[in-house]
Amino acid sequence: MLDIKWIRENPETLDKALAKRGAAPLSSELIALDEKRREHVGKVQAAQERRNAASKEIGKAMAAKDMGTAEKLKAEVGELKDFLAHAEEDERRLSKELSDALSTIPNIPLDDVPLGKDESDNVELRRIGNPHNFSFQPKEHFELGEALGYMDFERAAKLAGARFTVLKGPLARLERALGQFMLDLHTTEHGYTEVMPPLMVRDEAVYGTGQLPKFSEDLFRTTDGRWLIPTAEVPLTNLVAEEIVDMKGLPLRFTALTPCFRSEAGSAGRDTRGMLRQHQFLKVEMVSITDAESSVAEHERMTACAEEVLKRLGLPFRTVVLCTGDMGFGAQRTYDIEVWLPGQNTYREISSCSTCGDFQGRRMNARYRPEGEKSTRFVHTLNGSGVAVGRALIAVMENYQQEDGSIHIPEALQPYIGGLTRIEKAA
């Protein structure tokens, strides 16, 4: 959420930033609503002050046995109480209107984010590794998985409908191995603390990270009003909600391996075959909570941690910076890491690492107190996939496929899968 004080002082900056994201200007509307609210707050405060003063004057009048004055003051206090009952309700309503309006405004892109409308305007930063030249036509993961007998979409559809997968045998073990490998890397070498969070959260948590109120259709909701997490970013970031974090403990770095649940609203017809776009999928998430001065450097560090996963697995990838029109709602800047999929002959996203500034910190009311200062500031938050486990499975299958349809296991994963070096067709 953006600061209304900042908007009052920088209306043109806001409107220019919204234009970069392809949105209409909103500063005039927001400032007018805030002025109306502030005017009402002033009237309420004046009435409260007069009520308190009149109440004291009643006591003085009674002590002086000036009953006429006392009665007039009592009548005035009564009128002020009636006025305040309605005025305070109006103040709450106006404050909520402003808060609701602010909650739907996206974050302000950093100055170095490239201008653009969609993913075609994203800018490639680097490529690591060279795609393998196969002596045969490489297959897509679902062709490989079904031929091996360990990937079953038909039975998954029978159980749950479209966009689900049943993995069996060594492919199920391989997906589990990938998640464990990533967690071990991030916790033992990258300084993250592993967390096992709830998979269902309240409205406040999903609001804090920015999925609510604007993107509710992308989420699954339980009958008792909780939300299935679309990413572990939600519970990990909200660990510090409504808290003042010790400055000496920053940065806080959390990681988790969780199932994630997404309705994939608006994705009809996209990636309908295979595991690329699922309602339920495994992902390792990284979250950092920092002070204002450290968040830019932390973004580079987090992205490097995600890249290291793919380097260890020997998977070719590229890193791109998203343009203003392709960034997520809460991001100031986002790096996408795209892994090479030879079956599709293209790069596909496997990680997205974003710095959000104090956008989520303000929504969560999560603060820290800088050393030597009495006042607090909102924390800065960052989140990144470290990485999407299902998509890593796809990448391993496609990049390590053999001509006979078997899958070679990357050396880094072999200790996690009982020393197995190859996945072959089920007997």
UniProtKB/Swiss-Prot annotation:
Enzyme class: ligase
Alphabetic keyword roster: Aminoacyl-tRNA synthetase, ATP-binding, Cytoplasm, Ligase, Nucleotide-binding, Protein biosynthesis
Reactions catalysed: tRNA(Ser) + L-serine + ATP = L-seryl-tRNA(Ser) + AMP + diphosphate + H(+); tRNA(Sec) + L-serine + ATP = L-seryl-tRNA(Sec) + AMP + diphosphate + H(+)
Subcellular location: Cytoplasm
Binding site for L-serine: 231-233, 285, 385
Enzyme Commission (EC) number: 6.1.1.11
Domain of life (superkingdom): Bacteria
Keyword Protein biosynthesis: yes
UniProt cross-references to Gene3D superfamilies, sorted A to Z: Bira Bifunctional Protein, Domain 2, Serine-tRNA synthetase, tRNA binding domain
Residues annotated as binding ATP: 262-264, 349-352
GO molecular function: ATP binding; serine-tRNA ligase activity
SUPFAM superfamilies, alphabetized: Class II aaRS and biotin synthetases (SSF55681), tRNA-binding arm (SSF46589)
InterPro entries per UniProt: aa-tRNA-synt_IIb, aa-tRNA-synth_II, aa-tRNA-synth_II/BPL/LPL, Ser-tRNA-ligase_type_1, Ser-tRNA-synth_1_N, SerRS_1_N_sf, SerRS_core, tRNA-bd_arm
Pfam families linked to this entry: Seryl_tRNA_N, tRNA-synt_2b
GO terms of biological process kind: selenocysteine biosynthetic process; seryl-tRNA aminoacylation
Known partners and oligomeric status: Homodimer. The tRNA molecule binds across the dimer.
UniProt note: domains: Consists of two distinct domains, a catalytic core and a N-terminal extension that is involved in tRNA binding.
HAMAP family, sorted: Ser_tRNA_synth_type1 (MF_00176)
Similarity field: Belongs to the class-II aminoacyl-tRNA synthetase family. Type-1 seryl-tRNA synthetase subfamily.
Function of the molecule: Catalyzes the attachment of serine to tRNA(Ser). Is also able to aminoacylate tRNA(Sec) with serine, to form the misacylated tRNA L-seryl-tRNA(Sec), which will be further converted into selenocysteinyl-tRNA(Sec).
Database matches in PANTHER family: SERINE--TRNA LIGASE, SERYL-TRNA SYNTHETASE
Protein name: Serine--tRNA ligase
Organism: Brucella canis (strain ATCC 23365 / NCTC 10854 / RM-666)
